[in-house]
């Protein structure tokens, strides 16, 4: 590197210059959006160990954000209702991302502020604590590298972010959905999967962190407003990395002033109810037999090319389409599978709410594409249904997860039988909601157990009988 290049970004190279910069901002107030953004962009590329003046990096979760607040901007972090830069109305949020074979994705949800059930229910969206604190955010991103110490991490971009109109309409609906449960005395039933972009995630030292709610004597889990990791993934890709936009279902935010996103989808596909898959292909001009055919058909119904799962709204909300074929007797043949799990990684998961299964299932809204069997044996498009797992049922999945983890830690029993090898992982007969079994037919596709033995890949499933009941309940 030549001298001119070295001098172009002296803060990255010379620690003394960095220290001088840090001293200069001690006690400084940033009162305009422009000055805040300018200061934020000056940190880009600097190892965080060279920023940290207080030793915060040695502490737990949230340390990186605290380091930037204290050591870079020179103010004491607060967890109050005001934005971090109250004069400018800007909230500072540091968001990590992961780089993988499928591109960039957010490492986690973006937690905003604690929901005070006793106060928030009496507000409008525009006067809510969420909107007051987070309507404009300074988003600072960094790549999380599992094999590197935090001191090596570097902020790579900083932007001022305000919600685009098309997102804001959905976020306002999400806020209203959360408040409807609080006003109905059901804050204890809140779930991340209730909503699309803005969620009420659990927030506390442990599962016993609870708060009073206004219309019920039952304590409710402490929760915070948060932006789902699926939403943050799209924000990072669009606004930080400038990646190409995905096709949108909602062409104008005005559409969502009178109906919810789910209502809009249901209305658009209703004219196609009662048609077989082949009839839909002819009607919509689709010449495909791909595994994702039903997703393609739904996208066409909504005037979108490609798969519905690849639309901007479905990606932001993390909505997963699932085709369900209901037999004429009301039964469903197939249970609903989740991704296969790694036995060793699963055995090391310490808490349910930090587990891979919880963070897949709890915040996810599914769109069931339901085909009903007619008397002649043909299956016709019956309806779409947006669904997320109720809290009580999520607790039953928790129990199945707990027993699975304990069984793997103790040592799975593999028993040779005339029909093959059986095991003592939770079976469908043991729970009304979930079970564990192999995902595919290939018994030779195996992964190592913690004790070194090899075992056919397994995954969690929601029981077919459970899904049938969930569909039946809302008809």
Report the location of each language-model feature.
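Nucleic-acid endonuclease domains
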Residues: 2-475
């Amino acid at each position: 590197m030549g001298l001119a290049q070295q001098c172009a970004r002296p803060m990255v190279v010379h620690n003394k210059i960095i220290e001088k910069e840090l001293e200069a901002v001690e006690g400084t107030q940033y009162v305009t959006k422009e000055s805040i953004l300018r200061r934020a962009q000056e940190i880009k590329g600097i190892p965080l160990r060279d920023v940290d003046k207080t030793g915060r990096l040695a502490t737990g979760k949230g340390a990186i954000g605290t380091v930037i607040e204290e050591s870079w901007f020179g103010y004491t972090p607060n967890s109050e209702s005001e934005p971090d830069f109250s004069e400018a109305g800007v909230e500072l949020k540091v968001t990590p991302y992961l780089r993988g074979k499928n591109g960039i994705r957010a490492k986690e949800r973006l937690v905003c502020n604690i929901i005070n059930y006793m106060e928030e229910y009496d507000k409008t969206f525009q006067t809510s604590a969420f909107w007051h604190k987070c309507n404009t955010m300074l988003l600072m991103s960094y790549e999380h590298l599992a094999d590197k110490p935090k001191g090596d991490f570097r902020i790579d971009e900083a932007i001022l972010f305000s919600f685009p109109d098309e997102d804001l309409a959905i976020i306002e609906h999400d806020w209203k959905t959360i408040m409807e449960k609080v006003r109905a005395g059901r804050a204890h039933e809140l779930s991340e999967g209730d909503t699309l972009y803005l969620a009420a995630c659990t927030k506390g030292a442990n599962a016993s962190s609870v708060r009073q709610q206004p219309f019920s004597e039952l304590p409710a889990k402490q929760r915070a407003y948060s932006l789902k990791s699926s939403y943050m993934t799209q924000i990072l890709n669009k606004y930080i990395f400038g990646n190409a936009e995905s096709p949108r279902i909602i062409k104008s935010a005005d559409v969502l002033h009178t109906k919810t996103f789910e209502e809009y989808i249901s209305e658009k596909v209703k004219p196609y109810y009662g048609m077989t898959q082949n009839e839909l292909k002819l009607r919509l001009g689709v010449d495909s037999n791909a595994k994702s055919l039903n997703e393609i058909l739904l996208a066409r119904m909504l005037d979108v090319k490609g798969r519905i799962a690849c639309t901007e709204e479905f990606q932001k909300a993390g909505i997963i389409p699932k085709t369900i074929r209901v037999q004429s007797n009301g039964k469903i043949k197939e249970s609903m599978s989740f991704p296969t799990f790694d036995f060793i990684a699963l055995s090391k998961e310490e808490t349910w709410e930090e587990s891979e299964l919880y963070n897949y299932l709890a915040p996810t809204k599914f769109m069931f594409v339901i085909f009903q069997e007619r008397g002649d044996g043909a299956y016709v498009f019956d309806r779409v249904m947006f669904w997320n797992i109720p809290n009580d049922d999520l607790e039953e999945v928790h129990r199945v997860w707990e027993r699975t983890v304990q069984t793997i830690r103790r040592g799975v029993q593999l028993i040779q039988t005339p029909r093959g090898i059986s095991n003592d992982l939770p079976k469908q007969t043991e729970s009304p909601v979930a079970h564990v079994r192999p995902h595919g037919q290939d018994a030779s596709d195996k992964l190592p157990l913690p004790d070194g033995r090899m075992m056919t890949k397994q995954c969690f499933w929601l029981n077919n009988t459970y899904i049938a009941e969930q569909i039946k309940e809302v008809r």
